[in-house]
Amino acid sequence: MTFASLSTPTTAAELRYLALGDSYTIGEGVAESARWPALLAQQLRADGIAMSAPRIIAQTGWTTDELSAAMDAAGPLGEWDFVSLLIGVNNQYRGRSVEDFRSEFSGLLTRAIQLARGRTDRVLVLAIPDWGVTPFAEGRNRANIATEVDAFNAVKRAICASRGVAFVDISAVSRKFGGQPTHLADDGLHPGPALYLEWARAARSVARARLPGGMGREWGGE
């Protein structure tokens, strides 16, 4: 999929949302409206929070350093009311070291906090899902994939805790549903709309506690 840096005009009252990531953020294989950042924004609006549609800087296959380079290339990104970050699966997939990831992820998180006007409470990080449960991993060592993904996520969790940034662990729900055809895109690897909805629900409960606004109706995905 081609690089995406998408945005929707906002009104003065809307909170500006920047979503940073890779294929999981751009929503490889699903419609734009089914991407988890788009679903999260919809859910937060249902809660009475004036959230804009997200600007997305993401591309399938990106590693931490490639996302950072793309942010540089995007020019001045300005300031945002809310920033999400989901990155790292391609570092693991390509066999890159956890130690290199630690340094690069820490740098990305610093940038995300800066983009959120220095407010750590306005940054949200999602865990890397375990792609080893998907049909794409057939013939591979699924146990090793799970162990490696857990190691990368442990780094993310620890860095977020040290910075006071929310870490949303989607590991359990991804392992529960990530291998089911009803929750997969056609490629047998990436999540489908149903799984992205689960991710958005997990992120919603964390995000809405950190954003100004009221509580609205419960989101049923309609």
What is each residue range found by the language model?
Residues 3-60, 70-79:
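Serine-esterase "nucleophile elbow" of acetyl-processing enzymes
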Residues 50, 69-221:
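Alpha-helical cap/lid subdomain in secreted, periplasmic
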Residues 66:
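Active-site-proximal substrate-binding core of FAD-dependent oxidoreductases
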